[in-house]
Each structure stands twice: as structure tokens, then as C-alpha cells.
Amino acid sequence: MSAMNPLLSFLFNHPNPSQKFRDQVAQLAHSNYAILVPQISLDDHCDAELTPEAVFSHVIRISHTGENQRARYFASANGRTVIFKNDQVMTYRGYKNNVTVNIVDQYVYTPVCWYLPRTCFQNFLVYEISGYLTEKPLPEAPKEIDQNQYDGPSFEDILLIYPNVGRQLSRLLATTFDNYTSTAANTEELDLEFERATDRAIEYVQAIDPLMVRRIIEEQRLTETQLEKKIDEYVESQLSRKLWNALIALRTNEDGPLDQAVESIKYLSLNQVDLPENEKHWEAKVVAAANVLQTLANTSTNESLPCNCRFLENTLMKCIDTLTDDSIQVNADVLVSLLLVVVARANISHLNSTIYYIRSFSSNAVDSGKLGYMLSTLEAVMYHIGENREQLEAISEANRWFFERVEKGDLTEFDFERPSMKSGLQRDDADWKTVFAATNPAGESALMCAVSSNQQSSLTCLLDHFGYTQEDILADRSVQGSTLLVSALRTENEDIIKLVLDRVRDCADLAHYLSVGDEYGRSVGHYFFHSLYLQQQVGSLINWTARDNQGQTPLSSLCRSYDNPDYHALFKNALKTCLDATGMVDLRVHTDAKGNTLLHTVSDEKVLSTLLNHPDVLVNVNQPNKRGMTALMAHAKYARLKAIEVLCKDPRIDFAPTDNKGMNVFDIARDRRTADFLDECYMSLQPNLGETDKYCEILRSVIADGELCFVIKTRQDGKLSAVRRPYSDFVFLQKWLAHEQPLSWFPALMTPTNPFAIPHRPSREILHAMHLRLNLFLRTLLLHPTFSNHELLWEWLLVQDISHTHLAERTTKKLENKKEKDLEEYIILGEPEMDEIEGFVSHALQQVDLMRKATMNLHQASVKLCNAHRDYCKSWMLMKETVDELKEIPGTSPRENIIANLSSAMVTLGDTFRINNSSPFVFSCYIESLQNMADATTLALAHPLAQISHLRLQQMLLVKLQADAVALSEKKTFRDFFHDREKEIRLIKNRIHITENEIRRLSMETKNAQITLASELGGFYQVHEHELTLSIKNIVSRNIKRHKELQGDLEEIQRRFI
């Protein structure tokens, strides 16, 4: 099966590899390499050609060639160099282009390659990067430029683009700007001063090399007129503060009366400016436009704020655009009325001078176009204010008086004949009705103002004596869209809440009114935590699945109100009401925008227990949020011990999931008490090893004294102990156990990939893979018939401070004593005994070899399954990203709802797949451990066969030497050669003695090997069968669990679409 990633597929699934390519890949399989693979995307149109040279440029050797504090250098498989710096990879020596890409993901990949030995399953560290290292950047498509709209760079940018020009002009222009001081006696002279300054700047530009000026015009696609315009803008921006201050000083007499008039009509309302249509939908736009225009109010006093034409024009244009968006057609009369209220509420000074400044010093067309229309309209507004000042002041004063008393709660003795009510406002009811229907500068009606001011007396008086109908109450909205009842709920004043609720309770469409959201998207249901009685009265009318802007439903919002004294009563009643309304509570529906379920957010143990154990509440205990954290991880992160206790009592809890950073719950738990409790809960749930009450496992890693140490928890006789061991201690344990028992089969200790190979990006997945493989190593030792009760193993597991020297000396002495004891027994194997042992061992080897080959095939299949599952998860996330892109395409509301539901479905199913992503990898590691066990047993069984062959050779040599000794002793020789014959006889006898000792040793070792292997083969078969059954059972049970969760997710998705 080819890998989904094209680079991995080319490297390990090449359809027709050359011999050189195969040799290169084989070399990678026996060395420490990492692979940089480009991230997969559906629109992958990179022009990087997949050739062996390009592919091996993405394979780096982990051993770095050099380093400093900021970056590390790594050599590629074909001799090039890349730099790792923070989360980026940069090409260096050997690459044609300077390419910088980001690291987006990392994982361990085990290829199944047909042109590699079947026994070679090398684990590669894979870094997903945002692009190819060998690609040429695709040129950007040239944009079609409309010469009429193209503005080009500013003159200040031109000075930076052409430094030679900048150096020539900067000093001259700076001198001109610094020496400028206005001496104008009137505005006409001020205009002339500005023109002279602009002309002088243009002369400076014209004085430089004409060829350079022509080059600037051609390269920046400008005309001479456009260049002069940019010089004009540059001069104005540099002198703007001086020009502005001079203009304000010259126009003080003209601005003063108008500024006073604007300040006196601050409380003018939209319903009082003769709008031809309902003014309610204009209120929010007017408040927003006033906030925009308010930025001009500080221009005169704050020297740090800009006051150039570009800033002033942009501010005024933004104000107009806020009022006249594309969806609403606004004629001139309506715009003047709206701007009148905007100017009054913004309360800015020197507005006439602002208009004059733009008309006098702007380089844009100020008498035509949108800018001219805006200035003309503002002038019309200012003229209207000047002409109708007395009437507008009277209306504003009445509004101010009325709203001040509403805010102070002083409406009990309302009198129409107040001294402040000057001419312009009559006593008839029609005039005062406009005051009662007015809005304050914040856009609030009198009712809304009374509620937000928390004035019950004002609200009571308004409702009882001022003629407000139920329709007025239902239609009343704040600028942010809050209803009167929602605003009342925010005050947490029960009297005000009851007062408003009593006025709307009997309306025809109360459910719709209760579902209206405010600026946060929250309806009445989201504020139930304020009032238990309100929940009891209208809880059945609430949409319990409605979400606010944070994705919270009324139930999830209520569950977060921990500080409420009636928290448990609120939750109990809300759950009952929600169940009555919906029939079943599915916690997947009540997730917020960050993917947090109620199990993530609720920290109260009683509420959490109710959610987990209620028969009508559907809950996925292990559902992750968008950061990949399950509820158990979230509570472990914040050390919520009581919540963890409740979750750990649930049999559905899973400790295996990892978050988006690759951290599991044991990595996340930093608090000592929390970590110890999690360890205790996890270890208590694990089954015993064999028939004993023993179990051990590596739960986390720590850095101690600059070395990676593994925290090993051991359960024995109901007690839990912990030790920290570096990887070197595992090597020590393997070495000396095998040294003491050389005839036993021994599990292999694989050399791990360094998780800190790239220090800027340590790999949690590799670290957890190390945990798993070392756990399986210890598990095999504890199930081993010989080593399970070995004192060295248990001393290593239970005692933290051990002396390697002492243990090595003790093991060596034990082995020497055993050899001495064996030498005391005189055993010589004859041919029948050797045939018997050889037959037994050969048969066992044949059977174990068949099991080894079957296990190897199963391991290969499990690796394929693991890789396919990873690709499946990747493809699922790609599909989700593609669905998310559809959101950007405008469409009808039903279509947008379908896409939103589909995207949510993708997230739900993606979380289900991702959370079970570790299951195939764990299964593959289990099978790999069984294969290593079978390999070790095969090697152990092959040893006595080799010993028997050697023994037969030694026996044949002994017969030959004995025959030679007899022949020499019977041979007659001359007296002169007598000493030579005696010397040769002594040598042969010495060789006979050595051979007899070797035969004796081989016989003893072969016999011991037979006895040892005969006693261990049963244990091997039992352990192999038990572990294989357990691994299959685990992955099957996890898959069944996953499919049950998937079925629930699919039912929820079906409910959304139907």
C-alpha cells in the first residue's frame, strides 16, 4: 500500500527503483535519519520534481554538524545542509534556492518497503513542513492595474526606494519644514504660504538629475502630475500640525459659536429630525458613526494624533460609509438628518475648520466625487445647526432633562413647566411624546435607560404613566440588539426583571422574544443563572440548543456560574426543564466554540456525577476539545482533584488519548497530588501480570540532571512504588540479566529514536513510543518463566538508588559459582543423548520458527494498518478543511446552514478518529514485541544445535588424538629421537586433556541448555499466546467502542441535517 504523502510514497513505494536507489534506501534503514515531508493539500501544485536527488534532499541525518544557541545544522542524505531554527527549516549549503518552511506536525513512520528486508522495520521521525525544500517559488500572477485607480507609492516611500534621491532631498526638505513658521494674518495668506512651501519642494525635486526623475516616473508608473500630487501630499503631511494650529488660531471667532451650538444639542434624538421612515434601524449606525467621528474631537488637543488631509478625509469617509452601506439607499435629505444627530452626539469642535482645511490643503478633488458630496453634506448640516439653533437646543435640553431624571430615578413628580424648558418646546402632548420616544446619546430609549441604570422607580413610573404599550416594550432594543428583558437580566435586579417579565408574559409570541440574542448572541436562556424563578416560569419556552457567540448553550452557560449560591438548584432545575423540553440531553450538542463539553467546564463533583450517571444524558467521557484535550486532561491541567476523582470512577474513562501537542494526561498533570492520584487510579485499573498481583509501567518522563529519565510505577501486593530510570539503566539491566542467564531467551531492547534530536521541536510521539516499547520490554521480563522473580529485576524496579558496580560484581560472582558447581558434575554426552537433544531442539526450533514467521507477517500487516489509519485521519482532516473553504463562498442562508452543519460534522467525526489514532500503533508495537520474543527464542534454540555440532567435532578430534597418542607410544624409535617422541606424546596428551575438558564443558552447557529451554518453552508459548490474545482483544474492543461512538456521532449528524 502506497503512502498518502507523495514523498514518502516515492521513497518507500517506488514502482521501479534502480539498484543505486535501493542501496541508498537500505542505508537509511540502518542509520539514524529523519524525513522532512511537505504537508499534503488538495491543491498541491508545487513544481518540485520528485527525483531521487530532490527526495534525498529532504532526508536528514540526526547527528548535527554544528550548533549555536539559536540554530542547528543538519546534513541531508545527499550531502546538503539545512538549518533548524525555532519552528522553521531553512535551506543552506547545496540548495539552489533559499527556502524557509514551517514545521506543522511530527510523527513516527514505519515503512513497509518491498525492496527492503522483511525483517527491517526502521522507525523514522517524520516532520511535516509547509512546502518543498527544492521548489522554485511560483511567480505571482500579475495583477491587472487600472491606471486611473493606481495610486502607487507615497513620496516618502519613493525616498526610501531610491536612497540616492533621498539623501539629496532629505536635508533640503527637512530644513524647509523645520524653518516653517506661519505669519499669516488670514486664511488667504495661509493658503499662499502652503503653496510656496509646495512649490519649493517641487523645485528641489526638479533640481536633481532629470534622468533619475524620469526613471522614478517610469518605474513607478506615474505621470509628472501624479508625482507633483505626491509631493504636495508629502509637504502637507509634514506641515499638517503647524498648518492646523495656525488655521485654528485664525478661525477662532468663526468656530466658537458653532462649537457651542454643537455642544448644546448633544441629546438630540433621531425621532426629532424628521426622518421619513422608522428610525429604529438607524440607531446602531448613528452610534457607530458618532464613535468614528469622535476620533476627530481630540485632534486639536492631542499633538500626537495626526491631523493631515489623509487622516481627516479617511475619518469623514468612514463615518459616511458607516451610515450608507451598500444594502441601504440613502438620499440627501435622510443623510443630512442622520449626520445632524451624528455631529451632535460626537460633539467635536472645529468641524468648519476641518472642512476648510480639507478644501484648502487636500490634493484630491474636493468639489466632485464622493469626497465633494461628503463635504457638501457636512456644510449643509453645519448650516442647519446655525439656522435652527434655538429650536434644536430646546429639544436637546428637554431630552437631557428627561433622561437625567430617568437615570436618577426622579420621575415621581413629573412637571411639564420646568424653568429649564425654554422657548421652542410647547406644552402640548405631541411635543412631549417625542421626548418620551427619544433616545439618549448611547442610543437607549427611556425604558432601556431606566433598566441599564438599575432604576426600578423610573421604570415603574414610565410603564404606568407614560403610555408605553406592550408593543413598545417588545420592540425596544439597545444599540447592540439586547431586548429589554435581557438588559434587565444583566442588572441581576429581581424587581426589575419581574417588572419587565410581567409586561411581556402574555404576548402572542413569547418564545420568539425570549430567543432574541444580544451583542454576545445570548438570549434570555443564557442569563438563567441570575434568576431561578425565571427559569421555572419560562424555562419550557427556551431553545436549549441555541448558541451564543462563544458557542455556549443556555445549559452550558448556566453550568459555568460556579459562584452562584443556588448553583445546585439552578442546575437541577435546568436539567429537568431541558429534559422536559428536548426529551434527551446530548452533551455533544452543548459544546462551546472551543470544543469544550460540559465535562470540560464543570468542576463541581455533584454536577459532574449527575451528568455522568443520569440515564437520559448522552455523554462521551473521552470527547476532546479543539486542542485535543479530553475532560480528564482539562481537569488534570488545572489540578481539579475532586473532578478527577469523579471522572476516574467512570468505567468509560480512557487515559490513552493525547492532545494536539502529543501530551497525554500524565504529561499534563503537573501538580504532585494530581499526578499521584492519576497514577494510582490508572494502576488500579490494570490487570495483573500472569497469576500474581504485580504490574509495572512507565507513565511519564522527566528531565533530571540533563538526562531523560522514565518514571516507572510498580504495583505489588496492593502497594505502589516509583523509581526513575534513564535509558542507560535499561541497557545495564539487559546486559547483566543476559550475562547471568546466557542460555535463556531474552527480549530485545531496541535502540530508540532520540525524541530531542531537534531540540526546538521535541517529539512527544517518539517519547510515548519509547514508553510503550520499554513497557513491553519490562512486561516480557515480568512474564518470563526465568526472570519474572529475579532479584536483580525486582531490586532494579523497587530500589531507586542502586550501585551498578555492586550489582555487576554480584552477578559475576553468581555466574562463577554456578560454573564451578557445574564442573563438579561429570557429564559426557554420548551420541544417543546428543541425538535426543538435537531432535528435541530441532523440533522446537521448527515450531518456533513457524510461529516467528507468522508473527512477522502479522507485524507487517499491523504496520500497514497503522500507516493506513494515519493516512485515513489525514484525508479526513483534508476533507474538513475543504468543507471549511466553502464557508467563504457567499450563498443563501439555507446553504450556509448546511455547510456549517457539515463542517461541525467533520469536526465531530475527525475527533472520533483522532482520539483512537493510537490504537493501531499500540497493536503494532505489541506484535513487534511478540516478534522480538520469537526471534530471541529462535536464537536461544539455535545455540544448543551449534553446541552439539561443536561437541561432535571435539569428540572426533579426541578420537583422533587418542589414536595418535597410542601410535606414538607403540612406535619404536632411535635413542637419539627418544626425547622428541616423549615431547610429542606430552603435547598430544595435553591436547587430549583440553579436548576432554571442552567436551565436558560442551556436554554440560548443552544439557543445561536443554533443561533451561525445555523449562522455558512452555512459558514462551503461554506468554506468546496470552499477549497475542490480549493485543487482539484490546484493538477489537477499542474498535467496537470507536464504532459505537461513531454511530452516536452519525445519529447526531443525521439529526442536524433532518
UniProtKB/Swiss-Prot annotation:
Q: Which domain of life is it from?
A: Eukaryota
> Per the database record, which ranges form the VPS9 domain?
252-394
Query: InterPro entries from the xrefs?
Result: Ankyrin_rpt, Ankyrin_rpt-contain_sf, PX_dom, PX_dom_sf, UPF0507/Ank_repeat_27, VPS9, VPS9_dom_sf
Q: Which GO terms describe its biological process?
A: early endosome to late endosome transport
Database matches in SMART domains: ANK (SM00248)
One cellular component term from this protein's GO annotations in UniProt = tubular endosome
Which CDD domains does the annotation name?
A: PX_domain
MF-aspect GO terms: guanyl-nucleotide exchange factor activity; phosphatidylinositol binding; SNARE binding
- Give the record's family classification: Belongs to the UPF0507 family.
What is this protein's record name?
UPF0507 protein YALI0E18612g
Q: Which organism is it from?
A: Yarrowia lipolytica (strain CLIB 122 / E 150)
